[in-house]
Design a protein with these regions (language model features):
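A short, N-terminal "cap"/entry segment at the start of jelly-roll beta-barrel domains
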Residues: 1-56, 161-252
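A generic "binding-loop/recognition-motif" signal
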Residues: 69, 77-78, 116-117, 126, ...
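Double-stranded beta-helix
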Residues: 4, 117-198, 202, 303-321
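Short acidic-glycine-tyrosine-enriched beta hairpin
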Residues: 95-113, 282-299
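Conserved short histidine dyad/triad with adjacent acidic residue
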Residues: 41-48, 59-76, 233, 245-265
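Short histidine-centered beta-strand/loop micro-motifs
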Residues: 48-53, 70-76, 93, 101-102, ...
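Glycine- and acidic-residue-biased ligand/ion/polar-headgroup-sensing regions
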Residues: 77-90, 94-95, 264-278, 282
């Protein structure tokens, strides 16, 4: 019996926010934000509100903030790819945040390498939102720059060695647990340095995709990360990051459809950026809207159709190395 497709549809309006997901959450510029665990727990230090807690080979999260709010400098041990749904966002990187910066807007993609410090901030005049793909079922933990942990401690927030957070203004640190010490200078030097031109190779701008395909009709496919196979085509990636645990592509077109059904033995999700999309899964169908997430049942035959002009939809697939 085929599962009811609505059980695998995660609507943006139903996402459950975590208001204090990280140790920095009481610092100025980090208070007015919501973090979402859409698929899997992600790397939040306050585990709550997972929309779909089923291993997919990757995690999907989201963050929305008020203007001038964002995230402090941090590093990951697995991939972190940002999909901008509403901007603008400024990204900055380096141990002190001064190695480079870039402003990205709706539809832009950036894939940050591991073992580097990066942060971001909403530099618009309204609330902005973006989704993040984190590699693997267990994406590891966040490593914060030393200054973040020191400043957070002054607000009463401490990060423990087991990656849990304690607000010492409201509770005591458990006797059997220890506070995580900030990185020392030698440890900071082990993180990689990237120039602006290096990170530019990790960015795909939405405007460039649109201008290159204005005259095309029907469905168009692109691959951001890893070779992407669809509609009897194999698409080469535009970003040369690999072994991340997932492949990442997109489909766009004006009121067009993928005619042939296909199936996969691994997980696949759809996330519209623009327009409504109808998803056909064997004898069922469902409509998904921008910022919704639909996880297709494994092995089920599926195809999709763009219902609006200028439809654009992300596709993320589990990749077993």
């Amino acid at each position: 019996m085929i599962e009811n497709l609505n059980n695998r549809l995660i609507k943006y309006k139903d996402l459950i926010p975590s208001k204090k997901p990280f140790v920095e959450s009481k610092l100025e510029g980090h208070k007015d934000r919501s973090v979402y665990s859409i698929i899997g727990p992600g790397v939040t230090e306050e585990l709550k509100g997972i929309s779909l807690n089923e291993p997919h080979g990757f995690n999907l999260g989201g963050v929305d903030t008020a203007p001038n709010n964002g995230s402090s400098l941090h590093s990951h041990t697995t991939a972190e790819v940002f999909m901008i749904h509403k901007g603008p966002w400024k990204f900055f990187w380096g141990a002190d945040g001064e190695d480079g910066e870039v402003v990205l807007n709706k539809g832009d993609i950036v894939s940050f390498p591991t073992n580097m410090f990066r942060g971001f901030r909403n530099v618009g005049s309204e609330r902005s939102i973006m989704y993040t793909i984190l590699g693997r079922d267990d994406p590891g933990v966040i490593t914060w720059s030393p200054e973040v942990l020191k400043k957070a401690k002054n607000t009463g927030m401490v990060l423990l060695e087991d990656n849990s957070i304690v607000d010492t203004t409201q509770e005591k640190i458990p006797e059997n647990k220890s506070v995580l010490a900030p990185l020392n200078d030698e440890e900071v030097k082990t993180f990689d340095i990237y120039r602006p031109e290096d990170i530019e190779k990790c960015i795909i701008r939405y405007q460039d995709l649109q201008s290159n395909n204005d005259t095309n009709t029907g469905l168009n496919f692109i691959s951001y990360i890893e070779n992407f196979q669809i509609d009897n085509k194999t698409l080469a990636p535009m970003i040369s990051h690999n072994q991340l645990g997932f492949t990442f592509g997109a489909v766009f077109g004006n009121q067009s459809s993928l005619k042939n059904f296909y199936s996969l033995d691994t997980h696949e999700i759809y996330i519209p950026l623009e327009g409504k999309w109808k998803i056909y899964c064997e004898d069922q169908e469902i409509i998904i809207n921008p910022m919704d997430t639909f996880s297709v049942p494994v092995k089920l035959k599926r195809r999709f159709e763009s219902l609006d002009d200028k439809g654009f939809m992300y596709i993320v697939r589990e990749k077993i190395d």
